[in-house]
Amino acid sequence: MSRRSTALLKTALAAVHYTGAGNLLAPYTRGAGVIFMLHHVDPAPPQPFEPNRILKVTPEFLEAVVREVIDAGFDIIPLDEVRQRLENAESERPFACFTLDDGYRDNRDHAYPIFKRYNAPFTIYVPSDFADGRGDFWWLTFEKVLRAASQITLCMYGETRHFRLSTPAEKDAAYHEIYWWLRELPEAQARAVVAELAAAHNIDPAGAHAGHVMSWDELRQLAEDPLVTIGAHTRGHYALAKLGARHARAEMAESIDRVEKELGRPCRHFSYPYGCEKSAGEREFRLAAELGVETAVTTQKGLLYPEHAYEMTALPRLSLNGDFQDLRYVKALLSGVPFALMNTFKRYAGARPAP
């Protein structure tokens, strides 16, 4: 999301909160439930240049959200119960699920104690390569390159581009421009570009992020608690829609099989890496259904409605991220009013509204 879009969304959410529209309309717009999405839960203060801080929330904010959800009358449930709750939405209280992508060690160290304190079930989605200790955290490697460099040169869109990196602001602007260009490239090519930049600046991608994610042994130990569910997140964290059908299926199937083998229990839940429309679509939703998972989640923004019982491999989530660490925004989103307004706009614009 661009800075301008982020600012506009914050303004809209604040308006929903302060006008009282959320409280007034929630009974009609709230829907059946919500699946929250997180990545890092980290108490460290933000750095001057830290573009991936959007993936981080503080433990204090997470705990505030958990309390807000409970106080608002939501039941916090495991993903295993989502279908049943959607099918009986009219007779049930609203529900919330908490999910965390990638299997970062801070999930265990900082998020787990909070969920344990409130007896709140949660799911961690794990790319099997990450748990094996050989994951490619290219977005973090790229951040590390820009932090170390004073300038870089790249061939982008067929022309040579020079980026000055003298200040945090210059580094931040360069990161966002280049990041979205990389996201448009084929997966292998994008990762090769970052690997070449890392080599040119004497950065070892494998060593740069050692210790960031949990090993299989750590995941097994964590999963001994019945509050914890471990789901699959592909092998190598690829944008599946960019892959051929056979490759995409293998990424999904082998990660599901690996989670089952390592934990000794069925793997019933899946998360699409990146999860946006360009990264996961109808083909991937169909593959997930064919592979037998009970739920598969995207990063598409939205709440859950009874109709989602028929789209269990294309479920939206509500992101808890570093740009929106404010309970006003969470309350506004939980009301469902922003999504009702978005759907109204889509209807007038001729687009297909969300369920």
Language model feature labels by segment:
Residues 110-114, 218, 283-287:
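A short acidic, amphipathic alpha-helical/loop segment
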Residues 67, 109-116, 195:
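A broadly conserved amphipathic alpha-helix scaffold signal in soluble, globular proteins
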Residues 36, 41-42, 93-96, 116-278, ...:
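Metal-dependent polysaccharide deacetylase catalytic core of the NodB/CE4 family, i.e.
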Residues 64, 106, 110, 214-217:
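Short, well-structured alpha-helical interface segments that form or flank functional binding sites
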Residues 2-99, 106, 137-146, 153-154, ...:
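C-terminal active-site subregion of NodB/CE4 polysaccharide deacetylases
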Residues 101-108, 118-123:
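Conserved beta-strand->loop/alpha-helix structural units within folded catalytic cores of enzymes
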